[in-house]
């Protein structure tokens, strides 16, 4: 893929820097806790390069290398792993050049505590934006972005400063070992009312806009057996959401906050309790969409025009679940209502997801 998309003319003289024809691939990342999307879903992006170690040397550059058991697996996948947390941007650029890094892949973009100045200073002849920042960096020094035809269609290429490297079907990377455990959860674990219809969203609260929450409230008012199951985030967010429910005349006991699960496999297993997962907009589910689908639960999404609003749609398309993709607030609310009104459709969707998910390209890196 790299050979197909050559570096700019100004940089061609410096690439490749190694006479041994080994390509050095710098993975520039910040290692978070074991809940981190990158840690949990991208092991095999690195692991599968072991089949090409005569062509690639994989170097991990971390801005925060606090270790736990989850990270140990990731670190072990690299040929070299270097903690640069206490180094300056100039020192990191110097290190990269000293390591003869030919390709640097940025996994953070402009997200919190990123070090994008490193890429502005040109730490490698080829620099690629992947996964961490779902959109253009608008930087002349970021050469490429990895995407698919859903997240960046032909008409949108003009909006990107980067050249587009298209992956087939979906650009999302996954981990075949990230699967639900065999642990059984039931309504009693969360004190859900018997025969309730569980609507789930485990996105961070900052993604829940007033427009989306208003639609969820409309659904709760329309279907009396529905409850809303959210992930645990900040206390102020829970208070604000509860306040909004009360304003609309909805009993706060229909809002349930998930307990923290230490094992990701158990977290995925409990998602199976949900009847339907609801997406946010305009910043939709990314790693959480993967979690819903690998757990076998359908997700209704609202597809927008930005990269960040189309990641869920990309994954749903890879599973041929086009009917779960909506294009307006009205369509979104109507689709949720339609499925709740026809529980047999939800059952059929769950069966189809379970039957086809491991055959799809999404779950086959």
Task: Please tell me what each predicted stretch does.
Residues 5-7, 193-209, 213:
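Conserved donor-binding/catalytic core segment of Leloir-type glycosyltransferases
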Residues 153-159, 172-189:
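Acidic anion/phosphate-binding donor-loop and adjacent secondary structure
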Residues 2-4, 180-199:
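Nucleotide-sugar donor-binding and catalytic loop/hinge architecture
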Residues 8-141, 149-157, 229-363:
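Conserved nucleotide-cofactor-binding alpha/beta core module
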Residues 45-52, 199, 210-224:
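Short hydrophobic signal-anchor/transmembrane segments that target glycosyltransferases
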Residues 164-172:
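C-terminal terminal-structure detector
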């Amino acid at each position: 893929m790299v050979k197909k998309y050559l570096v700019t003319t100004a940089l061609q003289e410096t690439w490749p820097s190694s006479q041994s024809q080994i390509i050095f691939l710098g993975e520039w990342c910040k290692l978070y806790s074991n809940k981190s999307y990158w840690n949990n879903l991208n092991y095999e992006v690195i692991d599968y390069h072991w089949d090409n170690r005569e062509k690639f040397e994989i170097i991990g550059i971390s801005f925060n290398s606090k270790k736990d058991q989850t990270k140990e697996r990731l670190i072990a996948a690299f040929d070299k792993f270097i903690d640069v947390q206490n180094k300056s941007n100039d020192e990191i650029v110097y290190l990269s050049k000293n390591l003869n890094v030919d390709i640097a892949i940025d996994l953070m973009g402009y997200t919190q505590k990123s070090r994008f100045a490193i890429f502005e200073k040109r730490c490698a002849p080829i620099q690629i934006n992947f996964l961490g920042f779902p959109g253009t960096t608008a930087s002349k020094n970021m050469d490429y972005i990895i995407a698919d035809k859903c997240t960046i269609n032909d008409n949108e290429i003009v909006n990107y400063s980067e050249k587009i490297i298209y992956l087939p079907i979906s650009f999302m990377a996954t981990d075949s070992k990230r699967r639900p455990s065999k642990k059984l959860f039931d309504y009693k674990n969360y004190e859900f009312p018997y025969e309730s219809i569980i609507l789930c969203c485990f996105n961070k609260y900052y993604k829940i806009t007033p427009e989306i929450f208003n639609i969820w409230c409309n659904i709760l008012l329309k279907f009396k057996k529905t409850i809303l199951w959210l992930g645990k985030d900040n206390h102020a967010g829970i208070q604000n959401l509860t306040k909004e429910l009360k304003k609309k005349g909805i009993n706060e006991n229909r809002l349930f906050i998930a307990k923290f699960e230490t094992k990701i496999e158990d977290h995925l297993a409990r998602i199976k309790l949900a009847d339907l997962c609801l997406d946010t907009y305009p910043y939709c589910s990314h790693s959480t969409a993967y979690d819903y689908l690998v757990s076998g639960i359908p997700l209704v999404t609202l597809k927008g025009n930005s990269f960040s609003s189309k990641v869920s749609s990309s994954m749903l398309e890879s599973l041929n679940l086009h009917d779960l993709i909506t294009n307006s607030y009205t369509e979104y609310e109507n689709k949720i209502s339609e499925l709740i009104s026809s529980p047999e459709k939800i059952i059929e969707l769950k069966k189809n997801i379970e039957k086809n998910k491991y055959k799809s390209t999404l779950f086959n890196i």
